[in-house]
Amino acid sequence: MKTIHNATLVVFVALAASALVASGDKSTSAETGGPSAKARAYNHAKGNYMTAATVNLEKRDLVITRLFDAPVELVWKAWTDPDYVMRWWGPKGFTSPSCKIDFREGGKFVFHMRAPKEFQGGQDMYTSGVYKKIVPLKLIEFSQGLSDKDGNRIDPTTIGMPADFPGEIPSALAFKLVGNKTELTAIEYGWTVGHMRDMSEAGLGECLDKLAEALAKR
């Protein structure tokens, strides 16, 4: 199976809004026994916001850190402005025809990506979630999962995912200014099946590659 990114996001991505300036609705066209996902997010958010030195990660948490040659305001915008998200969302070869973002704590998002024709005939896939905590230019915590175009959760098996693919993943994005560049740390908490964590890591990595290309074009 080829890679499909559950996030982000991201969380959506999440996964996975330009509420950099103002909030509002903006749309275009584990291992068990460890701390809770919320507790881990707050642990990450201390001090430098999720730098490797302050992180106590569970074995199957997914963590990717990238340094982008762009100011933190622009990298933040790349995740919070629907038009900007559409420029890079999805793994290599995928496009993002639409994006809906209500960037505020408790607000919802729906990220849309379309597979290339050679992969599942150009199938449309959606990731939706809710923003849990926002620290401007520093931290975004959110839930994310596969959904329909309206943001309603779907059974992952209906789009070809394994039966044990998680319905929802707690996630976070941390932003840190490093000189004139921005360090971004993307985290997806509590993956319980290793190969699916690896699959999401590959997809998220390709998304961030495309983000770097979009940022280079400003």
Predicted regions and their residues:
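Bacterial N-terminal signal peptides that target proteins for export
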Residues: 2-10
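Hydrophobic/aromatic beta-strand elements that line small-molecule binding cavities or substrate pockets
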Residues: 66, 98-101, 127-133, 168-176
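Signal peptide processing junction and immediate N-terminal pro/mature segment
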Residues: 20-38
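Bacterial N-terminal signal peptides
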Residues: 10-19
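A short, structured loop/turn motif at beta-sheet edges
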Residues: 72-73, 101-106, 132-140, 174-183, ...
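Hydrophobic ligand-binding cavity/cleft-lining segments
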Residues: 33-96
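Short beta-edge strand/loop motif at the mouth of beta-sheet-based domains
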Residues: 83-126, 130
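Beta-strand/loop substructures that line and gate deep hydrophobic ligand-binding cavities in soluble
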Residues: 141-145, 151-205
